[in-house]
Swiss-Prot record:
Keyword field contains Aminoacyl-tRNA synthetase: yes
GO molecular function, one term: ATP binding
Stored Gene3D superfamilies: Cysteine-tRNA ligase, C-terminal anti-codon recognition domain (1.20.120.1910), HUPs (3.40.50.620)
InterPro entries assigned: Cys-tRNA-ligase, Cys-tRNA-synt_Ia_DALR, Cys-tRNA/MSH_ligase, CysS_C, Rossmann-like_a/b/a_fold, tRNA-synt_1_cat_dom, tRNAsynth_Ia_anticodon-bd
EC numbers, comma separated: 6.1.1.16
One example of a Gene Ontology biological process annotation: cysteinyl-tRNA aminoacylation
Complexes and interactors: Monomer.
Protein name: Cysteine--tRNA ligase
Signal sequence extent: none
Cofactor(s) essential for the protein: Zn(2+)
Enzyme's top EC category: ligase
Amino acid sequence: MLQIYNTLSKTKEVFTPLVGNQVRMYVCGMTVYDYCHLGHGRSMVAFDVITRWLRHRGYDLTYVRNITDIDDKIINRANENGEPFDVLTERMIAAMHEDEARLNILKPDQEPRATDHIAGMHAMIQTLIDKGYAYAPGNGDVYYRVGRFAGYGKLSRRRVEDLRIGARIEPGEAKEDPLDFVLWKGAKPGEPSWSSPWGEGRPGWHIECSVMSTCCLGDSFDIHGGGNDLEFPHHENEIAQSEAATGKPYAKSWLHCGMITINGEKMSKSLGNFFTIREVLEKYHPEVVRYLLIASHYRSPINYSEENLREAKAALDRFYNALKGLPEAAPAEAAEHVERFAAAMDDDFNTAGACSVLFELAREVNRLRDSDLPAAAALAARLKQLAGLLGVLQLEPEAFLQAGAEGKVDAAEVEALIQARLEARAAKNWAESDRIRDQLTAMGVVLEDGKGGTTWRLAD
């Protein structure tokens, strides 16, 4: 029985789709003005694992993750670069897809772009105006009347009267209430714009997601996800817009993943601790980064540090060392392990608990390796199958364990030395065998002798 923590109710609930076996999930994606940072990677990986598990459980999932391709940040960055905004966004979208592929992230079923849904935004804004939830003061802007929506604050547990304390209307704004937010922004010189019933302009951020989600998934759908930094005001405003426009409940369950901290501090450019995914992947294998991001529960914060990355690498080394050198086999039943893995994942996608089951399997594989090779191989196959549901342990063990050797050691030289050592051992020339091992150790190479022969990896 799958249970999900719903931010809307602040409780863990038994998950029941709105319609039969169909699950419709929308996740807020990237604003494509720069390369993806680790926080984006956290959200990408979290909802990738959720996608994999929902499909494994047999649900007919439609996964939609949007792209925000028009926004203040995009316009500012394009102007800084001296390039059209759409040239910038195309380049950043391509880079995002490269990062996702390296992190073994499945593609969403649909990836709508905001600029492809301008007409839908016009329609929803007009509906809100017609219903009295929005107003056009005549300066090209259109605003949402927060005070008109009785349920405002139900997601974030904020009270409108508290929000009004200290709020003020900025110069140049034509708001009726300081809490009102923009649905359509009147055009400014030098900025991209589209024609609309209220004049040239562009959409506000919040209306983009309301329109893209309902266009792709319908007025009501099962799951809405994103980082917990989006809970307010973005997701709160989405609810206000969508439910006022359609008269129906918007998303049934709201899932929010935790943030990334860097050595215990919030990641930010001003603190100089801001890392893009590609910067991290220059130093660490993509699977190490992915494992770091799944080793904690998706709602928990993750502290990014060199030490934690080394621990993630060590964990994967243990897994791949358990898998290596074993013959192909059908997965063992391993009913107890399978049940506990499923119980962890059914408990609000508890990947930390699931990973602990993988460690137990790896220990059992190692225990059986010398006494019952077929049983060890079958259990290793089950370990790999379960790990695949988390998107890890799908490489050839030697490929992972030797990854990063390029530019550090000559693989051909290592193989030649290993062969020379084998010949020395066969001739019982133990001194020569030890000399070669010492030479390889000095090169940073770790040898591991087993029934299947000698394998090697780089020292941590």
